[in-house]
């Protein structure tokens, strides 16, 4: 497996970010808790352009950190992730709050990249002084459930969202 690193999204990656986003169909997003968002790219749907979204990212520095996981050999974006420094920042029902959101480009799935990307995000959380993170995923998202468990996630519970009609699994992941 080639080396991947996390990079902060920037204007230089505008075209690659657009290509990444375009690869997601409604069917692929439906497996997530919020079917209007691509995980790890929160709030992109609220902006008319990627540069506008990048400006938004600057406004939440210190609360949320976004990263792209990138192939070092060719600069291809294989994943996006965000690390929410505090659960109370989440604007949804607090029971459904999550410190981490992530996605892998559909054409690059089932290759172990999500596991590696989450490992890198946990290193970033440790650097920020966090001792654990809470992560949620839909009960039907087998890949995400496995990724979280592979990174030391401890199953907390399954909760049903009355408004969304979805069941999610909640995990706590200790950071060592």
Question: What is the predicted role of each segment?
Answer:
Residues 135-145:
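Conserved beta-strand-loop-alpha-helix junction that forms the acyl-donor binding cleft
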């Amino acid at each position: 497996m080639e080396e991947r690193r996390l990079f902060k999204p920037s204007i230089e990656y505008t075209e690659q970010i657009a290509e990444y986003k375009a690869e997601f169909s409604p069917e692929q997003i439906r497996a997530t808790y919020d079917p209007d968002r691509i995980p790890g790219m929160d709030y992109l749907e609220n902006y008319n352009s990627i540069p506008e979204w990048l400006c938004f990212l600057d406004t939440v520095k210190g609360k949320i950190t976004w990263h792209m996981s990138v192939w070092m050999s060719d600069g291809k974006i294989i994943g996006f992730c965000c690390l929410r420094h505090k659960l109370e920042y989440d604007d949804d029902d607090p029971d459904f709050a999550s410190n981490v959101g992530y996605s892998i480009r559909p054409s690059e799935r089932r290759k172990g990249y999500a596991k590696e990307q989450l490992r890198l995000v946990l290193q970033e959380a440790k650097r920020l002084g966090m001792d654990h993170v809470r992560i949620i995923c839909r009960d039907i998202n087998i890949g995400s459930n496995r990724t979280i468990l592979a990174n030391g996630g401890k199953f907390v519970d399954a909760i049903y969202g009355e408004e969304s009609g979805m069941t999610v699994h909640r995990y706590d992941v200790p950071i060592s």
